[in-house]
Structures are given as C-alpha cells and as structure tokens.
C-alpha cells in the first residue's frame, strides 16, 4: 500500500513541476507579446546608415593623379588603373579606372590611403544584379552619386532600432 502512495506523491510532484515549467514559458511568451516587432518593411522602410558606413565607392575622375596607391593598399589588388605618361609635361594621365564590386571586400583601404581624396564611400549597399559583369563599374559609373535615402520621398526612413520600438 505504501509504494502506491509514494508513487502517487511522485506523480503529483511531477505534475506540479511540469505545470510550473509550462507557466514559466507562457509568461515569457506573454511578456514578448507586448513588444513591437524589430523587423522593418524593407523596400518601403530603410534604416539610415551611419556616416562611417562602407558602401559603394564614389570616384572623382578629375582629382585622380594615377598614383596607384589604391591598388597597392588593396588586399586583393582590385582597382584597375590605366594611365599614359605624358612626356611633354612629365605627368601621368588617367585613361580608365574601374572596380569590380563582385570581388571587392569593402575594406575601405583605398579610400583611406588616397592622397587626393578622389575616392569616398557612399551609403549605397543595394548592388545586387542578375549578371555579375554588371558589378564591374568604370569611372563613369563610379562617378555617379547615389540618391540619398533621406532624399527619397517614397521611402520611410528610420534613424535607429530604438525608434521602431517607440
């Protein structure tokens, strides 16, 4: 008779313990139900990137002196700089400058070490294409400034994640 009573007591304790665990999980679920979602509706809402964000590189053709410092500091020797030596003035003349963003790791070394500041990072990060050859930007494509997220009236901008919660 006593083993049956002890088994019943163990069963009761196990039931109470299981109910407590289920209750704890349910309380956590209810505490998260009051919070707003952290996700944003991406094409229509975008986070404003920080000033130091390393997006697509912007290139100013007129400032470049074809020194090739950007190529030397790039860990993957990515920028392609074509130039011709002008013998009458003894200076290099830039013919072509291109960067393949399919290979670029966006480290920012080229921007940091450029002596004439002809390279800068933009806030553009939507570089996806269906053809990888479209990611090879020449000096004309690199010279175009992207539209700022703040200036685009079709997009609702969100400063940071704390603004989503309020």
Curated annotation (Swiss-Prot):
Binding residue positions for [4Fe-4S] cluster 2: 74, 104, 107, 110
Q: Name one GO biological process term.
A: photosynthesis, light reaction
Q: What is its EC number?
A: 7.1.1.-
Instruction: Write down the top EC class of this protein.
Output: translocase
What's one GO MF term for it?
Answer: quinone binding
What the record notes about the co-factor is: Binds 2 [4Fe-4S] clusters per subunit.
Location of this chain's protein in the cell: Plastid, Chloroplast thylakoid membrane
Binding residues for [4Fe-4S] cluster 1: 64, 67, 70, 114
The catalytic activity, as recorded, is: a plastoquinone + NADH + (n+1) H(+)(in) = a plastoquinol + NAD(+) + n H(+)(out); a plastoquinone + NADPH + (n+1) H(+)(in) = a plastoquinol + NADP(+) + n H(+)(out)
Q: Any idea where the 4Fe-4S ferredoxin-type domain is? A: 55-84, 95-124
Which UniProt keywords are present, listed alphabetically? 4Fe-4S, Chloroplast, Iron, Iron-sulfur, Membrane, Metal-binding, NAD, NADP, Plastid, Plastoquinone, Quinone, Repeat, Thylakoid, Translocase
Extract the PANTHER family matched here. NAD(P)H-QUINONE OXIDOREDUCTASE SUBUNIT I, CHLOROPLASTIC
Q: What does this protein do?
A: NDH shuttles electrons from NAD(P)H:plastoquinone, via FMN and iron-sulfur (Fe-S) centers, to quinones in the photosynthetic chain and possibly in a chloroplast respiratory chain. The immediate electron acceptor for the enzyme in this species is believed to be plastoquinone. Couples the redox reaction to proton translocation, and thus conserves the redox energy in a proton gradient.
Q: Which family does it belong to?
A: Belongs to the complex I 23 kDa subunit family.
User: Whom does it interact with, and what assembly results?
Assistant: NDH is composed of at least 16 different subunits, 5 of which are encoded in the nucleus.
Q: What is this protein called?
A: NAD(P)H-quinone oxidoreductase subunit I, chloroplastic
Q: Which organism is it from?
A: Psilostrophe gnaphalodes
Q: Name the gene for this chain.
A: ndhI
């Amino acid at each position: 008779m006593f083993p049956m009573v002890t088994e019943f007591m163990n069963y009761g304790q196990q039931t109470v313990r299981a109910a407590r665990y289920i209750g704890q999980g349910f309380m956590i679920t209810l505490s998260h139900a009051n919070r707003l979602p952290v996700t944003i509706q991406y094409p229509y809402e975008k986070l404003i990137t920080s000033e130091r964000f390393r997006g697509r590189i912007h290139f100013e053709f007129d400032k470049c002196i074809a020194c090739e410092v950007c190529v030397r500091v790039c860990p993957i020797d990515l920028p392609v700089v074509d130039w011709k030596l002008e013998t009458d003035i003894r200076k290099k003349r830039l013919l072509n400058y291109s960067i393949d963003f399919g290979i670029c790791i966006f480290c920012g070394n080229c921007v940091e070490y450029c002596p004439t500041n002809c390279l800068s990072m933009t806030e553009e990060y939507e570089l996806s294409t269906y053809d990888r050859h479209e990611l090879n930007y020449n000096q004309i494509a690199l010279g175009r400034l992207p539209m700022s997220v703040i200036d685009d009236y079709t997009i609702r901008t969100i400063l940071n994640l704390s603004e989503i919660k309020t």
